[in-house]
Amino acid sequence: MNNFVVRTITGVLFVAVLVTGFLDPIAMSALFALITGLSVWEFTGLVNNRQGVSVNRFISTVAGVYFFLAVMGFCSGVTPSTVFIPYLITIVYLMVAELYAKNEDPIHDWAYTMMSQMYVALPFSMLNVLAFRAMPDGNVGYSFIVPLSVFVFLWVNDSGAYCCGSLLGKHKLFPRISPGKSWEGSIGGGLFVIAAAAGVWYLSEQYGYNDVGLNMYEWMGLGLVVTVFGTWGDLVESLFKRTLGIKDSGSILPGHGGMLDRFDSSLLAIPAAVIYLYTLTLL
């Protein structure tokens, strides 16, 4: 079976699982708790291959998964804010443990440990902020439309950028880090996303899924934010891999590489979407 077929099958299954997972809050939580764990495990495994680095892979992964579930519990109104105390204790432990580990460069261990939480676990956890919101009656409601739309915009951007870049690409976007990306592709991808955002607004209005109450221009703004920060997220992961001297972050997804390869764009796009939507509430 050639790589194109493998990549296509993996991609279709990936999209199907992700879309299905968003339809139910329990399924979403379970799916992204797993994705968070696999991603933190992958990240810590990669940095541990660097000379002098020895991050506690198991505890970092457990901490990342716990943080995701804690944010989910808090955002859904199931648990109080005290749910974060065990996570904070774990972070303190990971810092103090370096005093006794006698590693040659504890600063690197601290930095990579915190990066596994800030760069990987935190963005995935912010999906809960997008999915759960307080209702007028005092209860907490779940809506899949915004978190799912973030991923739809990222997929549309990838496809649009690839098509436009292949046909029109002449000016390199960031040749030092990602030689294959062009300005033409990035702009084309952004235009596709803006059109897709208008489509999401129309369909959500028609079928009653626009729980967040965004108008068409606010949806288009969200699409633009996701496009810009998604592109930066892609470039950040490319820089990370170049620094480590690797092509793919892993091989868990046949034809697509590792978890970080598949979710790189979302790691900056999700927090940016949260900030954008919060900013709208202040205007």
Regions found by a protein language model. Name each.
Residues 1-224:
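Membrane-embedded alpha-helical bundles of polytopic integral membrane proteins
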Residues 161-162, 166-167, 238-246:
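Juxtamembrane interface at the ends
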Residues 209-217, 256-258, 263, 282-283:
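Short, conserved aromatic-histidine micro-motifs
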Residues 225-230:
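Transmembrane alpha-helix interface/packing and boundary motifs in multi-pass membrane proteins
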Residues 242-265:
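Interfacial loop-to-transmembrane junctions
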Residues 269-270:
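C-terminal-most transmembrane helix of multi-pass membrane proteins
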Residues 275-283:
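Juxtamembrane boundary at the C-terminal end of a transmembrane helix
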